[in-house]
Amino acid sequence: MKSFCVKAPAKINLFLHVVEKKETGYHLIEGLFVFANLSNFLEIKVGEKDFRYDNPIVEFVNSELKISNKYNTVMRAVNLLLRHAPVRTKVTVKVVKNIPTSAGLGSGSSDAGAVIRTLGKLWKIDRPILNEIALSVGADVPASIDSKPVLVRGIGEELCYINKFSLPTNIVLAKPKKKFLSTPEVFSKYGGNFSKPIEWRDDTEKDLLKLLKETENDLQEIAISLVPEIRDVILALESQEGSILSRMSGSGVTCFGIFDSEENAKTAAVNIREKQPEWWVCDAQLIV
């Protein structure tokens, strides 16, 4: 029996544009994905080749929402990976949830990415196959394999990694408690005012703040129409000392604020938590 304890970090969309809708119904996006040191923890156990093969076992702990143990991103990822395993074996995964679910932070996608990264390395599965598996599990999963700052395009399959990250890494995450949004629901209400693809130049990485001020989250207003408290969260983040930029991540409901120092970020989190005890609030650092 081999056992692995791995982290699955929260995903944050610094900007997110919807650029096209295909006839298949898929939306093509463009966005800057980053990851934070707020993580779910996974314990992955793999039986030796003489172990009886069985369906994977997946258990979730500490989740705000009830997650099916049979129909989830981790189960899908493991089942697809097992097709490429060198031997038939038994896999069990225990996921301790610290990242809010259905909240725009890629909690399920990051779990799947961590499983693909870990078992892919163990079983020496080629990276192109891992990328295919990741994309079949979800649009955010390919970027979640490496969990590095990355410009994402298409339906999640086009990845351009950021070599020089020119932003402060101090952030605060906040969301109204017991508020959740379904990604398909939010996208289904997108009206079709598509954004033009950004012009990524050689010097764009040198001033990512300028890029962020020229971009936005195209899903933010739709999410606010469904959960109006999102606007209050953004305003609360913007009003704190040292705030540089605040907006919603993904399809919501979590919002992020970038701060000029770790001290100001921690103070902002305390202030918001005191004024809004019903919100979930967390200060964190981006992984760069």
UniProtKB/Swiss-Prot annotation:
The residues annotated as the active site are K11, D140
- Which residues are listed for ATP binding in this entry? P100, T101, S102, A103, G104, L105, G106, S107, G108, S109, S110
Please give the Gene Ontology molecular function terms for this protein: 4-(cytidine 5'-diphospho)-2-C-methyl-D-erythritol kinase activity; ATP binding
Identify the EC number(s).
Answer: 2.7.1.148
Keywords tagged on the record: ATP-binding, Isoprene biosynthesis, Kinase, Nucleotide-binding, Transferase
Looking up InterPro entries in the UniProt record yields: GHMP_kinase_C_dom (IPR013750), GHMP_kinase_C_sf (IPR036554), GHMP_kinase_N_dom (IPR006204), IspE (IPR004424), Ribosomal_Su5_D2-typ_SF (IPR020568), Ribsml_uS5_D2-typ_fold_subgr (IPR014721)
This protein's pathway: Isoprenoid biosynthesis; isopentenyl diphosphate biosynthesis via DXP pathway; isopentenyl diphosphate from 1-deoxy-D-xylulose 5-phosphate: step 3/6
Q: Which GO terms describe its biological process?
A: isopentenyl diphosphate biosynthetic process, methylerythritol 4-phosphate pathway; terpenoid biosynthetic process
Instruction: Please write the reaction equations for the catalytic activity of this protein.
Output: 4-CDP-2-C-methyl-D-erythritol + ATP = 4-CDP-2-C-methyl-D-erythritol 2-phosphate + ADP + H(+)
Q: Which domain of life is it from?
A: Bacteria
EC category name: transferase
Alphabetized Pfam families for the sequence: GHMP_kinases_C, GHMP_kinases_N
UniProt function note = Catalyzes the phosphorylation of the position 2 hydroxy group of 4-diphosphocytidyl-2C-methyl-D-erythritol.
Please give the family membership noted in the entry: Belongs to the GHMP kinase family. IspE subfamily.
**What NCBIfam families does its record include?**
ispE, PRK14608.1
What protein is this chain from? 4-diphosphocytidyl-2-C-methyl-D-erythritol kinase
What organism does this protein naturally occur in?
Wolbachia sp. subsp. Brugia malayi (strain TRS)
The gene it comes from is ispE
